[in-house]
Swiss-Prot record:
This is Potassium-transporting ATPase KdpC subunit 2. It comes from the Bacteria. The gene is kdpC2. Pfam families: KdpC. The system is composed of three essential subunits: KdpA, KdpB and KdpC. The lineage of its organism: Bacteria, Bacillati, Bacillota, Bacilli, Bacillales. It is found in: Cell membrane; Membrane raft.
């Protein structure tokens, strides 16, 4: 009986410690030390939330930089996800031999009309990648300059200003940040 009492006491202590004290401590530390990140790294414009630095959005208008392809169409609306039963995040899981991947790559190449960056035709693992490589961004400059009737050198300068270095991969830019800055030109 004493063993059962000690076991139940330990379960109760661990429940309180792991279920309440630890999560509240981590949440409080996050809010104090990293308030922006702890709240989703939200981007606001005129006091209204327009996106997050960490989650990509679907950009279809030719006057904007387009992000990576998303197998889930950047759908983060919880109600739509619940109704459709579809995932809120996830890659396409298309292998190199999959005809659907080949078809999608060919369609993208046909739209862009030239050799393009690999991240322009492949989805990220989460399907919600907010960044594209600098090469991908530079390949979109001609289209954007034509649509906005502005000099391509201004857009290239904008890309260079927003470039973030990566020690293990290609340099990249955040698509949302780039498009917000583009609208200010």
């Amino acid at each position: 009986m004493q063993t059962i009492r000690k076991s139940l006491g330990l379960v109760l202590i661990m429940f309180v410690l792991c279920g309440f004290i630890f999560p509240l401590t981590v949440t409080a530390l996050g809010q104090v030390l990293f308030p922006e990140q702890a709240n989703g790294s939200l981007v606001k414009q005129d006091g209204k939330v327009i996106g997050s630095k960490l989650i990509g959005q679907q950009w279809t208008e030719p006057k904007y930089f387009h992000g990576r392809i998303s197998a889930v169409n950047y759908n983060m609306n919880a109600n739509e996800v619940k109704e459709s039963g579809g995932p809120a995040s996830g890659g396409s899981n298309y292998g190199n031999s999959n005809p659907e991947l080949k078809k999608r790559v060919q369609e993208t190449i046909k739209q862009e009309g030239k050799k393009i960056s690999s991240d322009a035709v492949t989805a990220s693992g989460s399907g919600l990648d907010p960044d594209i490589t600098v090469d991908n961004a530079k390949q979109q400059v001609k289209r954007i300059a034509k649509e906005r009737n502005i000099d391509a050198s201004k857009i290239n300068h904008l890309i260079d200003e927003n470039k973030q270095a990566s020690p293990m991969a290609d340099d990249y830019v955040n698509v949302l940040k780039l498009n917000i800055t583009l609208d200010k030109l």
